Amino acid sequence: MPIMASTLYRDMLNFFRNQFASILLLALLTALISVVLGHALSPGSEQLMTLSDGTHLGDTAEMSLQQLVQQMSVEQQRVLLKASAAGTLAGLVGNVLLAGGLLTMIRQVSNRQPVSVLRAIGLSAPLLPRLLLLIFLTTLLVQLGLLLIIVPGILLAIAFSLAPVIATSDDLGAIKSMRQSSSLAFANLRLLAPAVLFWLLAKAAVLLLATQFTLVSSLVAVVLLNGLSNLISALLLIYLYRLYMLLRQA
């Protein structure tokens, strides 16, 4: 019997609704960790002020990003690199904790062993190093694909979408999980492509919303936006987990 997308969406929404409080708490907790870590690792306000030294908006409006970086001093480039690295690392840690905690929570609930959010994160600890490498590699490849030409990035996002579920469910390494995910993804494109595309569009919408709050320095606003982004990712992970369980049974 073929797997129906409508069944997957219904199962996803049922689980999301039944475990909403725990999922919301996990999304906000990982968002808070990500924001605090990014703030702790980022350059201080005085260092960030050096990025605007000697630059004028009128002069840089026509420049590409590469030209803008080339116009910076060595100190400004160092500050920019540190800020970018801090944001990337903080986001990566948040995504790893979210994926590990949520996938562990789903597995425990499916086995009729409900756990708290902190307990789920604790149980996922042995999986976190593997997920860290996996999510780093997949994020890097997808981002490169989106930067070069959008289509390859989307295809890579679809190809590697099942990898976190495979890594945690089958106890496989990052490369093997990515390889197995690719073969399954393109064999089940009709079930994966719409979900991944919706996830990409929803994350882009949250990013656009975040740009409207660039003048708002409130930690609460930043955490809430990150939490919303995490909820979107949580929906996709629930969908992917259910799909993979059905594929294993087929």
Swiss-Prot record:
Keyword Transmembrane: yes
Record keywords: Cell inner membrane, Cell membrane, Membrane, Transmembrane, Transmembrane helix
UniProt-listed Pfam families: UPF0259
Membrane disposition: Multi-pass membrane protein
Parts of the chain that traverse the membrane: 20-40, 86-106, 121-141, 146-166, 191-211, 219-239
Cellular component aspect of the GO annotation: plasma membrane
Cell compartment(s), UniProt: Cell inner membrane
Similarity remark: Belongs to the UPF0259 family.
NCBIfam families found in the cross-reference section: PRK02868.1
Name of the protein in question: UPF0259 membrane protein SG1383
